[in-house]
A protein has these predicted regions:
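Short, solvent-exposed loop/turn segments enriched in Ser/Thr/Gly
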Residues: 2-7
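Terminal, low-complexity interaction segments
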Residues: 12-16, 198-277
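C-terminal edge beta-strand
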Residues: 18-28
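N-terminal targeting leaders for non-cytosolic proteins
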Residues: 29-155, 166
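Short surface loop/edge beta-strand patches of beta-sandwich-type extracellular domains
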Residues: 158-164
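Extended extracellular/luminal ectodomain segments enriched in beta-structured repeat modules
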Residues: 166-173, 244-245
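Short coil-to-beta strand junction motifs in C2/discoidin
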Residues: 185-204
């Protein structure tokens, strides 16, 4: 066995001297973070329920979970499965979603006129068979919001996922796509940003940290907007180049700048995160 690959030479008795070469690839065990209730394996979550759907806020903006008045920290954990977890970072001196974070969602909206912050948790995708917005026809997914750049206006902590048990593992991949808010602004712009032109781009960046808290060498990138077009369907983002990490920060950056830094909405949706075990 070498590099995860097993080669076997087989000479069947009726092959008349021919050698049949078979190549088998060893398959690593993987656990998947799907955000679907049927796959929830943890204890009670922050609202006392044992499912993912109870972590979806009742309002996309200003709701009681992501913008609490009681200082309750929005958080989630995929305990006893991938062990991935997340909570809102302290982006603006508090722990609310306007400072960034990763929010569970099942909202979808195919109407670009709704592409604003009031609909910030909606994905711009609807499965033709199920009618749901998640990857592979599923209901639930997660929405990232937050960024940092060199403008001096956005330099707070980035939203992140981490392994709640402190064990470093390889996050193999996740599936990503646009939110309705980003899709609208890329196509039409708004009061804060121009639409994306033919040479503009928006990309996602993953920043990994090892068990010693040191950043790993490689930063995988994924272009939501770029020369090859706009990503409007769930698409695989390979994160395996990070290697074994205990934490991953995510950033959204791009070429549009309104004089105050990156001006497109710093959102993306992700689903079906694969972790090697």
């Amino acid at each position: 066995v070498k590099d995860g690959e097993l080669k076997i030479l087989v000479t069947p008795s009726k092959a008349f001297g021919k050698v049949i070469k078979m190549q088998l690839r060893a398959v690593r065990e993987a656990h998947f973070l799907t955000f679907e209730d049927v796959d929830y394996k943890g204890d009670a979550n922050m609202v006392g329920e044992r499912n993912w759907s109870s972590l979806i806020d009742s309002q996309q903006y200003g709701g009681p979970l992501l913008y609490p008045k009681n200082n309750q920290l929005y958080n989630w954990s995929d305990a006893n499965n991938t062990f991935l977890a997340s909570e809102l970072p302290n982006g603006w001196g508090d722990y609310q979603y306007w400072g960034g974070g990763h929010a569970i969602s099942n909202y979808l909206d195919m109407d670009l006129t709704h592409g604003d912050f009031q609909h910030q948790l909606a994905v711009y995708y609807q499965d033709a068979k199920t009618g749901f917005g998640g990857h592979n026809g599923s209901k639930n997914f997660c929405v990232h919001y937050g960024y940092a750049d060199n403008s001096g206006y956005a330099n707070g902590p980035l939203p992140y996922i981490y392994f709640g048990d402190g064990v470093a593992r390889v996050v193999d991949h996740m599936y990503v796509t646009m939110t309705t808010y980003l899709a609208n602004c890329v196509a039409n712009g708004n009061g804060l940003t121009a639409p994306a032109g033919k040479d503009d781009w928006v990309k996602l960046v993953a920043i990994g940290y090892d068990e010693d808290g040191k950043e790993v060498a490689t930063r995988p990138e994924f272009y939501l907007v770029g020369a090859e077009g706009n990503i409007l369907e769930w698409t695989k983002w390979d994160l395996s180049a990070l290697g074994k990490v205990v934490k991953i920060d995510f950033n959204v950056t791009g070429s549009n700048d309104n004089g105050y830094g990156f001006s497109q909405p710093a959102y993306f949706a992700y689903d079906d995160v694969a972790v090697r075990f």
